[in-house]
Amino acid sequence: MILHTANFFISDRRSFLGQDTPESVPSVSKMPERGYSVTGLDPDRTVKCAGRELRISPKASVELCRTIRGMKLPEAKKLLERVIEKKVAVAYRHYHKEVPHRRNLTEPFYAGRYPQKAAGRLLRLLEELEANAEYRNLDTERLKIIHAAAQRANKIPKRNPRAFGRSDLLQGTTTHIELVGFEAE
């Protein structure tokens, strides 16, 4: 008899040796439970959404999240639409090495960029947050973004073909983004 997985082999071997107790049988591993990095929220007046492993720049996402944190939802959506149109630049306060100076920044600082791809994905997440608020009967005009966080996620291995049959290993970056809105009075 051929056994295909290691769990069957272990369980059959233990039963053969007379060790088949519930604590000795290996448990099936679960998927990880991904929570939010903010706690202590009022469940009746808050709404959450998250984007996991998005193919956008973590640096641009951190700067965008820092910019929209504390804004009302319609104001944040307008700002992101203007960033996509290249009308307003996002100030890069943390990742500002070799970043050019911009005149039309979101706040008083010298370095900034127009992170269009990250702004587009964040705009989609804001629309999801708005849909979640409408589903929970919250007023979207009074919804304030109290938590916006971006973290680096897993790397995606990629190959770049080179001459003579060789290839270089590249790593694509992904980002986790969390948004929490609170219905202000």
Regions from the language model: what does each represent?
Residues 1-30:
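N-terminal amphipathic/basic-hydrophobic helices that include classical n-h-c signal peptides
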Residues 14, 66, 161:
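Short glycine- and Lys/Arg-enriched binding-loop motifs that mark or flank ligand-binding interfaces
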Residues 30-139, 180:
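Ribosome large-subunit tunnel/peptidyl-transferase-proximal elements
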Residues 39, 148, 182-184:
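Generic beta-structure capping elements
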Residues 56, 163-164:
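Short, solvent-exposed beta-edge and connector elements
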Residues 140-163:
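Extended, charged amphipathic interaction segments
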Residues 165-185:
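C-terminal edge-of-domain segments
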